[in-house]
Amino acid sequence: MGLPSQVLACAILGLLYQHASGGLIKRIIRQKRETGLNVTLPEDNQPVVFNHVYNIKLPVGSLCSVDLDTASGDADLKAEIEPVKNYEEHTVNEGNQIVFTHRINIPRRACGCAAAPDIKDLLSRLEELEGLVSSLREQCASGAGCCPNSQTAEGRLDTAPYCSGHGNYSTEICGCVCEPGWKGPNCSEPACPRNCLNRGLCVRGKCICEEGFTGEDCSQAACPSDCNDQGKCVDGVCVCFEGYTGPDCGEELCPHGCGIHGRCVGGRCVCHEGFTGEDCNEPLCPNNCHNRGRCVDNECVCDEGYTGEDCGELICPNDCFDRGRCINGTCFCEEGYTGEDCGELTCPNNCNGNGRCENGLCVCHEGFVGDDCSQKRCPKDCNNRGHCVDGRCVCHEGYLGEDCGELRCPNDCHNRGRCINGQCVCDEGFIGEDCGELRCPNDCHNRGRCVNGQCECHEGFIGEDCGELRCPNDCNSHGRCVNGQCVCDEGYTGEDCGELRCPNDCHNRGRCVEGRCVCDNGFMGEDCGELSCPNDCHQHGRCVDGRCVCHEGFTGEDCRERSCPNDCNNVGRCVEGRCVCEEGYMGIDCSDVSPPTELTVTNVTDKTVNLEWKHENLVNEYLVTYVPTSSGGLDLQFTVPGNQTSATIHELEPGVEYFIRVFAILKNKKSIPVSARVATYLPAPEGLKFKSVRETSVQVEWDPLSISFDGWELVFRNMQKKDDNGDITSSLKRPETSYMQPGLAPGQQYNVSLHIVKNNTRGPGLSRVITTKLDAPSQIEAKDVTDTTALITWSKPLAEIEGIELTYGPKDVPGDRTTIDLSEDENQYSIGNLRPHTEYEVTLISRRGDMESDPAKEVFVTDLDAPRNLKRVSQTDNSITLEWKNSHANIDNYRIKFAPISGGDHTELTVPKGNQATTRATLTGLRPGTEYGIGVTAVRQDRESAPATINAGTDLDNPKDLEVSDPTETTLSLRWRRPVAKFDRYRLTYVSPSGKKNEMEIPVDSTSFILRGLDAGTEYTISLVAEKGRHKSKPTTIKGSTEEEPELGNLSVSETGWDGFQLTWTAADGAYENFVIQVQQSDNPEETWNITVPGGQHSVNVTGLKANTPYNVTLYGVIRGYRTKPLYVETTTGAHPEVGELTVSDITPESFNLSWTTTNGDFDAFTIEIIDSNRLLEPMEFNISGNSRTAHISGLSPSTDFIVYLYGISHGFRTQAISAAATTEAEPEVDNLLVSDATPDGFRLSWTADDGVFDSFVLKIRDTKRKSDPLELIVPGHERTHDITGLKEGTEYEIELYGVSSGRRSQPINSVATTVVGSPKGISFSDITENSATVSWTPPRSRVDSYRVSYVPITGGTPNVVTVDGSKTRTKLVKLVPGVDYNVNIISVKGFEESEPISGILKTALDSPSGLVVMNITDSEALATWQPAIAAVDNYIVSYSSEDEPEVTQMVSGNTVEYDLNGLRPATEYTLRVHAVKDAQKSETLSTQFTTGLDAPKDLSATEVQSETAVITWRPPRAPVTDYLLTYESIDGRVKEVILDPETTSYTLTELSPSTQYTVKLQALSRSMRSKMIQTVFTTTGLLYPYPKDCSQALLNGEVTSGLYTIYLNGDRTQPLQVFCDMAEDGGGWIVFLRRQNGKEDFYRNWKNYVAGFGDPKDEFWIGLENLHKISSQGQYELRVDLRDRGETAYAVYDKFSVGDAKTRYRLRVDGYSGTAGDSMTYHNGRSFSTFDKDNDSAITNCALSYKGAFWYKNCHRVNLMGRYGDNNHSQGVNWFHWKGHEYSIQFAEMKLRPSSFRNLEGRRKRA
C-alpha cells in the first residue's frame, strides 16, 4: 500500500502547492472510505493515470523465493473507467478526470503454494488495499467549491438535502452523490452502471447480463469456463498463466517439452517406444530390461535372479549345485537329486508318501516299515495270536483286539459288560455268564417277582424295588408316603391327607369348612384370632381389640359420624364435618375473627396521616397501632368504635416512615391485621453547583441542612434518553456535601437532581444541567508494521463526535508532523513512506463543534529491512554454504533458521554481518540426503526483519564400517552400518582377480548380505553404494577372500556281526556340517540306503543288515550343502544264532520249572509263551534275559494241560520256536457254609472240609452295599466254626470262605447274613414352645427305614403317632397343650422288624401374648397394645430400647393389654418387647419395632431480601435428617420445590420476581419420614427490569456472572426463554446463540433442528432460528464473533445485526464491521438460511450438503461456523476466511448479540 500512497501524495502536493500557506505541516482532507472500484472526479487537465506493478515477496511459510519484475500479459491490458457511483452535475467532462489504475498479478505457477494460508491472507490484504486506494477522492483543486459561481466561504452546512435516503449531499459538487443503483437529482431513480451497456436487464440497480457478457455493467466479454482459474479473461479471450494453454486454459503444458520422442498429455510427457525421462530424451535399454533391472548408460543392470542382455533369462538357485541343468530359471536335477537347487538326495520311491526323506534315507511314519516305507506294520506283531494282513491283525480263534492281545468272552457279554481275561464283568442291572439276564433292583426285597428286570410287587408294597409300604389312597397327592403312613403337606390332615386344615384350627372360635374358618360371632380374621368391631368401623377407623379407633374427622362407636375441628370453638355449627361460623368469625374451626380489608392512606402531611378501611361484618371496635419502621421507635395505639371505618393519626415526626396496622376486635378477640407503610414529607436541598467536569465524571457540591435525616440521593439523568434507563442514582451519607460522580458517558448532557432521604423516603429535589467532556479515541494500536508502512487502528470514542484529527511523525523530531482529518466513522488509517527502524508517535483527538477531547497517543517502531538475493553456493552430505546481499539498515547480525522440509525441530544460527556487500555462512551438522527450508533475517537488539528464504539439500552419505565375516569356500558374509540419509536401495559390486565384475541391488532395509557361488580360496574387491533416484553416495570398498576346502580320509570297518558292523574315518574338527554314508548289498545293488551323521562324529554303528551278506560302503562329507569326494570300503556280515532243547520239571497245581540249551550265537532275550491245550485261558508270555537258561512259571490253573513255546531274540531277530507239554495237579475243596445266632453286631459261621488237608481258612466279610471296608479273618485249619462280632446293626453282609494249603487257595464258597435292627439312644428335647417341641435321638449304628414316635399326656389321653424317615434323627411334635407333661416313645423300624423302644418326659412352655401393635406415634410418645395369652398369667413384662438409649423395663398386671410409652426421642427406631410371666415360667418374648416421628425445624425466617433473591435460614430439628424439602410459592400461585442437604441451615432463593410476596414452607425429611411444615412470608424488592428482554437488561439488574439466565421476549412475562449470557466479554450483556469448542455436538442437521435449536447451552449448541428472529426483532442489535485457536484470539463486531422471520427463510442482515478477525460476514449479508434439506443458497450446488453444515450460504461461504469440527479439508471445517482461511478448522467460535445502544459506558457503569 506504500507505493499508491506515495504517488497519491505527490500528485496532491503538486495540485495544492500554489494554494498552500507554508509551514512544515501539510493538512490532507480525507473523506469517508467507501468500497467499490476507482472513482473519477472532474479535473481541468488531462487524465492522470497511476499504473502500479507490485513486486510481491512471498512469506517464509510458502518456502518460495520468486521475484516478478513484471506481470506477464499486462502490457496488452487497457484500463477501463468503471465508476461505481453516479454524480448528478451541471457540467460533465469525462476527459477531465483523475484515474487510479492498479494491476496486481500473481501468476498461478509462480510457486506451488497458492493455497497456503499465508498466501490467502496476502490476497485478502491486497483486496483490502485495493478497496482503500479506490475509495480515495480529492476535493476540487481550488479552495472554492465546485458549484457554479461559488465563493470561498467559512462555516458549515447545518441542513443538507435528504437525497431520498439513497445518497449523501456533497458541497463540492453542490449535489447528491448517489449510492450504487440510484440516480437523479435526489437519487430517487433506480439505475444500473452505464445502463448495462444495452447488454443486459437492469433489475433493482443490478445488471443481469446476456450470455457472453459479464461484469457489473456487462462491459466485459465472458471467457469459456472462466479460464478455469488458470488464466485472466481479457476481452473474452483467456490469457493463460505460465504452464497452461488452450481456449479455456484447461490444458497443462509439459515443463520441459517432450522433444521429438514424445507428446504432452495432461502436463506429462507420454514417450515414444524406446525413450523415457521427463522430456523423453533418454533412450531405453533392450526390451526395457523386461522390467527386471535398471537401464544404466543404455545397458541393463539386472535385478537379482535375472541375467542376459535384456535381463530376459532367469538364474537358477545356486547354479543347481552342478547336479542338474538350468532351463529358464528352473533346475532339472540328475537322478538321485531333487529340490529347487538339486541340493537334496532322493529316497527310494519317495518313501511312498509314508515317511520323510532325510539325506536319501526314508524315516518311516508310525505303522510303516521297509527301505521305502511301503509295508504296513501290525500293532505288537499281533502278539503271535494272529497274522498281519495289510497292517491289520487277523486274530486266531478265541482272541480279539487290535493286536490280538485280548481273550474273547461268551457272546461278547451281549454288550452289557466288560470282558476281562475272558470273563464278563456285567454292567449294573445285568447278570449271567454272558450278561444276558436283566437284574431287578435289590432283588425286589423278596416282596415281589422279577420279570425282565422289573419288580412286580406284592399287595401293600410299592417302589422300583418293592422296598416301600403303600399309603391309603396314595395320600391323595397331598402328602408324602413314609413306611405306609401319610405325612401330610401343610394345610392338609387325615389318614390319607384328604381333609383341608384351617389356620391355627380357627383358635376354637369357629368352624373349619373346606380349609376356611367360619368364625363365631364377635370374632374375625383368617384364623378367627381377632375380635371384630361394630360395622367394621364403617371403613373410617381401625379395629383394635374389638373397639374402633376412628380416623381424624370421624367419631362414634362405629366411626360413622363426621366431627368438626375443635367443635367449632362454640361459635359455629357442625354440618357434615364442616363448621358454619357465626357472624364475625371465620376459619375451619371458627377460631379466627374476620379482619378488615383495603387499608388506604390519604392526606399525608409532615405530622398527620388519614386512614380508611373496609369491613363487611359488625365488630365491637377497631384497634389502630403505628410504629416507626426504624429500630427503637415507640409502638403507639388507639381504638376506633366498631361502626367507624376511618381514623386520623396525629403528632407524627416529619420525614419518618411508619408501619400502621388495623385489627378488628370481637368479644375481646383480635383478627389478623391489615397493614400499610407511610412516611411524612421532607424539605428540599439548596446550593447545588459543579466543581470539576471530566469525560466520565463530575464533581458536585451543595449546601448542608440542619434538620435530622438519613442521607442524600444524587440522580444523574441522561437528557438524550427518554426513559429512566439513563438514570444513575447515588446514595450518600448525611455529613457529605460533595460527591464525585463517575461512570458518565462522554459528551452527554445530564440533568442532575439532589434529594434528602430519611427512613428510605426521598424528599423533593433540586436540579441543574451539565455536559460532560468529549473522550478521545481509545485502544490505539499500530498493526501490520513493516519497514516503511503501518496500519493505525483505534476504538471509536463513546461520545457523538463530528471528526477525528490524526497526527504522526518521528518521536525524536517534534517539528516533523503530518496531520490527517478523518470522519467520525473511521477506526483505522494506513501510514506509508516511513523510515526503517524508526520510532514514531501517533496522536488522536476527537472534535464536535467547539469541543475537543484530550489527545490520545501511541508509539511504534518500524521494522528492519530483510536481506536480499539469498542463494546456495555449495553443499556436502552434512553442510550447506549460503550467500546473500546485506540489509540497508545498521544491524547487529543475521539469524539463520533452518529445518527439514519433511518436518522436525528447527535450528537457529547467528552470523555477523559481512564487511563487503554480501555475507556468507555455512550450515554444518546437517542430516545427509535431506532438503532443508532456510530463512535468513536481519537482527538488531531484540528486533528481527522479515526472512529471506530458500530450499537446499545435502548430499547422500555412504554406508559405514563395511566388513567381511564368516568366509567359507563358496560364500562371504558382509556387514555394514546404514547411511543416515533416506535412500531407495544399495548397489553392491564385487570383482574377482580375473577382472570379472558382478553387480546387484540390495533392499534399503538391509545391513548385511551373503555373496554366494564364489570360488574357494579367491580374493574379491567389494564396493557398496547408496542410491536415491539418480543420486548416489560415495562408494565404500573392502577386500575379502574365501576359504580352502578341508580334507577327508582313512575309512575302515570293525566289530562285524551277523546284522551289522562299525565304521570309522578321519576328518578335520568342525570342518563339516555332516557325513553321508551309503550302504549297498554287493550282490543286489537295489538294496541301498543312506545314513547321515553330524559333522563332529567320526564313527557310526551300522545295524539292521542281513546275515552272512557282502556290502559296499561309500562315505562323503557335506560343507554348507556342498559334498566332498567319496571314500569306499567293503565288508561281509556273520551267521544267525540258534536255540536247542526245552525241558519241564517240578510240576504243582499252579506252577512248574523250565530249562533249555542254545547251540550258536549270543542272545539279547528269550520269550516263553504258555497256552492251555483247550484254548480256554488267556495265553501267558514271559521275557527272560539272554543270559538265562532256566525259568519258574507260576499262577497256572490246577488240573490243566499246557503247551510251552520258547524262542530266542538277537538284535531284533527271532529264532525258530521250540516247545514242550505239561499238566498241573488238582486242588482240595471247602463246603456247607452256614449262618446262625444273629445279633445287632454279629452272627456265627460254620462249614465242612476234609481233615488235615488245609493249613488255615480265610474268611472275607463285607456289607452288600459296599459302604465299609471288608473284614478278613484267618482261622486255624482244625476249626470248623467262628463267631463274627463288631458289625453294623441291621446290615446285610456277603461272606466268602476258602482254605489255604501250602500257600495255595481252594475254590471259595459264599453266603449272605444280616444283623438285627438296633434301638435309638439318647432321647432329648429342644425348641420347646407352648404347643410344639422338637424331639431328637441318636440313631442306631445301622441305617433303618423309619422311626415311630408316639406321645401322650402323662395324665392320660389318646396318643399321637408320627412316622419319621430313617435318615432323620429329630422331628417336631405339634398340637401340644401349654404347660402339660408328655410321655414320648421312639422305635426303630427296618422292613418288618422293629427295635426295642426308648422313652422320655416333655414339659411344654407357656404361650406368649400376640398382636403387639404400636399406635398414636408422635415425635415423643406412643401407645403399645397387644392380645392376651390364652393361659392365665400373673404379669406382662414390657421393655423398650433404641440403639443409643438404655432399655426401659416395666411390669404390668396380667389383666392389662396396653401401655403408654413417654419421653421418646424423635426420629428414633425403638424395639418394643412383651412377654408373660407365671411363677417361674416365662413365655416367649413378643417384639416389634416402631419409629417416632420427625420433629420440625425451628425459627424459619427470610433475610437479605432483594429483587430476585432472598436468604432463608432456620435452626435444625433435634433428630438427624437426610434432607430438607423447601417449598416457596408466589402470591400468583407459582410453586417451586427444592431438596436440600441435611447440613444446610440456609438457602438462597434465586430467579424470584421483583415486588412479589412469597410464602416459604420447610419440612425435614429422614428417608421416608417427614416432619410437620413450618412457614414464613416475605416480599421481594423492586428491579430495574423485572422481566429482562435480553442479557443486557439482566446485567443492568446486577447479574455479573456468565451463565444460564431466563429472559422474557419483549419483556412479556408469558414468553420466557432460557439463554446463556456472556457477562464478561467487552462489557458483558451478550446473548450467546452459537458455540463450537470440542466437536461433541453434530451440527450437520436438518431444517427442523436449526429452526428449533439444539445442544447444551453450557457446551456446544445452537439457539434456534425462530428464537434468534424473536430476539433480534426486539430492537437494533449488534453482533460479536469471538474466535480462539491455540492461544491466538480474534474477534469481529458488526454494528447492525438481525434475522428475518420464517417467510424470509430467516434472512440475515449484517453491517458495520470492526475487529481483528477480518470482515467475512458481510459476504453473507441478505442471504436466507440453508440446510441440506432446505437449499436456499445462490450456488449451483447444495452448499450445506457439500460442506456438511448449515449457514446463510451464498456461493458458498466465507464463514462456516457450523462446519465439521476439526476437519481441515477445504471449506469443510469451522472456517472464518479472513482469519484462518478455508483450509483450517478453528478450535473455538462463539456468536453473540446485544442491543447496539448498550455500547455506551454509562449503562455499564450503572450496572456496577
Curated annotation (Swiss-Prot):
Q: Which residues form the propeptide?
A: 23-33
Q: Which UniProt keywords apply?
A: Cell adhesion, Cleavage on pair of basic residues, Coiled coil, Disulfide bond, EGF-like domain, Extracellular matrix, Glycoprotein, Proteoglycan, Repeat, Secreted, Signal
Task: Give the range the annotation lists for the signal sequence.
Answer: 1-22
**Coiled coil location:** 118-142
Record domain Fibrinogen C-terminal: where: 1582-1797
Q: Where is the Fibronectin type-III domain?
A: 595-685, 686-775, 776-866, 867-957, 958-1046, 1047-1138, 1139-1228, 1229-1318, 1319-1408, 1409-1495, 1496-1584
Location(s) in or outside the cell: Secreted, Extracellular space, Extracellular matrix
Task: Tell me any Pfam family this protein matches.
Answer: Fibrinogen_C
> An example Gene Ontology cellular component term from the record?
extracellular space
* PROSITE patterns according to UniProt: EGF_1, EGF_2, EGF_3, FIBRINOGEN_C_2, FN3
On tissue specificity, the annotation reads: Expressed in the brain.
Task: Report the residue ranges that make up the EGF-like domain in this protein.
Answer: 176-188, 188-219, 219-250, 250-281, 281-312, 312-343, 343-374, 374-405, 405-436, 436-467, 467-498, 498-529, 529-560, 560-591
Report the InterPro entries cross-referenced here: ECM_Regulatory_Proteins, EGF-like_dom, EGF_Tenascin, Fibrinogen-like_C, Fibrinogen_a/b/g_C_1, Fibrinogen_a/b/g_C_dom, FN3_dom, FN3_sf
Induction statement: Induced by TGFB1 in embryonic fibroblasts, in vitro.
Glycosylated residues (UniProt) = 38, 72, 168, 186, 328, 603, 643, 751, 759, 1050, 1090, 1101, 1112, 1153, 1183, 1416, 1736, 1769
Query: Which cysteines in this chain are paired by disulphide bridges?
Result: C192-C202, C196-C207, C209-C218, C223-C233, C227-C238, C240-C249, C254-C264, C258-C269, C271-C280, C285-C295, C289-C300, C302-C311, C316-C326, C320-C331, C333-C342, C347-C357, C351-C362, C364-C373, C378-C388, C382-C393, C395-C404, C409-C419, C413-C424, C426-C435, C440-C450, C444-C455, C457-C466, C471-C481, C475-C486, C488-C497, C502-C512, C506-C517, C519-C528, C533-C543, C537-C548, C550-C559, C564-C574, C568-C579, C581-C590
Listed Gene3D superfamilies: 2.20.25.10, Gamma Fibrinogen, chain A, domain 1 (3.90.215.10), Immunoglobulins (2.60.40.10), Laminin (2.10.25.10)
| A GO BP annotation | regulation of cell adhesion
Similarity comment text for this entry = Belongs to the tenascin family.
Subunit and interaction comment? Homohexamer; disulfide-linked. A homotrimer may be formed in the triple coiled-coil region and may be stabilized by disulfide rings at both ends. Two of such half-hexabrachions may be disulfide linked within the central globule. Interacts with CSPG5.
What does this protein's UniProt record list under function? Extracellular matrix protein implicated in guidance of migrating neurons as well as axons during development, synaptic plasticity as well as neuronal regeneration. Ligand for integrins alpha-8/beta-1, alpha-9/beta-1, alpha-V/beta-3 and alpha-V/beta-6.
Query: What is written about domains in the entry's comments?
Result: The fibrinogen C-terminal domain mediates interaction with CSPG5.
Q: What is the protein's given name?
A: Tenascin
Q: What is the lineage of its organism?
A: Eukaryota, Metazoa, Chordata, Craniata, Vertebrata
